[in-house]
Regions:
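Non-catalytic extracellular/periplasmic "stalk"
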Residues: 1-110, 114
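Catalytic cores of peptidoglycan-degrading enzymes
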Residues: 103-227
């Protein structure tokens, strides 16, 4: 009976080890995907204490081996819990990264108007508040979603012309204006880096460019602060 119990315990240990290996692989896959380097102190302990035992099983040694296997089973369960906690933490961190608008929204880096106060581009002398970045680019060039989220609005929006607004998590929203073509519709889910439209000059615009805005809890912020 004790030999049968020992065999069952050994089988549990094998299953624990297989489960642990799968979780650890998942953690490392998440780390590689997002380029995360795991600090040494954050890693679950790699060594498993109390592993070992006689090479041949005799009846008099069965109790000792069963105790060793029980200890190993408990250690593997604790380590699995640690890796699961780490995996949950990584997923939360990765989700936050996906929802943070820190990508550049188009191929061109040529900013013609920065965030903040400026002269009105239509009359050249009156003061004007500019709540985003104006980035000049070729007509028809791609526009990218700078973070993942749901398209809150896609269509014509007053002086912004063809316009997209995306609602991300953590209070972030992004807006893309004066576009020539819109590839996504209201209610669509877009992923970070996805092409959502083309550079244009619709609405109140002096030439092909992208007007790009970032809002945090409804307040316009400088997009450069996140890049």
């Amino acid at each position: 009976a004790k030999l049968q119990e020992l065999s069952e315990m050994a089988e549990k240990v094998q299953k624990d080890m297989a489960n642990l290996a799968a979780i650890e692989k998942n953690v490392r896959t998440q780390m590689d995907k997002y380029g995360i380097a795991l600090k040494e102190e954050a890693k679950p302990e790699n060594s498993l204490r109390g592993i070992g035992g006689p090479s041949s099983v005799e009846i008099s040694e069965t109790t000792v081996l069963m105790e060793q296997n029980k200890n190993l089973h408990q250690q593997l369960q604790h380590k699995t819990e640690d890796w699961n906690k780490l995996l949950t933490k990584l997923k939360k961190e990765n989700y936050r990264k996906e929802m943070t608008p820190n990508l550049w929204p188009c191929n061109s880096q040529y900013v013609t108007s920065e965030f903040g106060g400026r002269y009105n581009p239509f009359d050249g002398y009156s003061s004007d508040w500019h709540g985003g970045l104006d980035i000049a680019d070729s007509y028809g060039a791609p526009v990218y979603a700078t973070a993942s989220g749901y398209v809150e609005y896609s269509g014509w929006y007053y002086g912004y012309g063809k316009y997209i607004r995306i609602n991300h998590d953590y209070g972030y929203k992004t807006a893309y204006a004066h576009m020539a073509e819109l590839y996504v519709s209201s209610g669509d889910y877009v992923t970070k880096g996805e092409v959502i439209g083309e550079i244009g000059s619709t609405g109140y615009s002096t030439g092909p460019h992208l007007h790009y805005e970032v809002l945090l809890w409804g307040q316009e912020i400088n997009p450069r602060d996140l890049m």
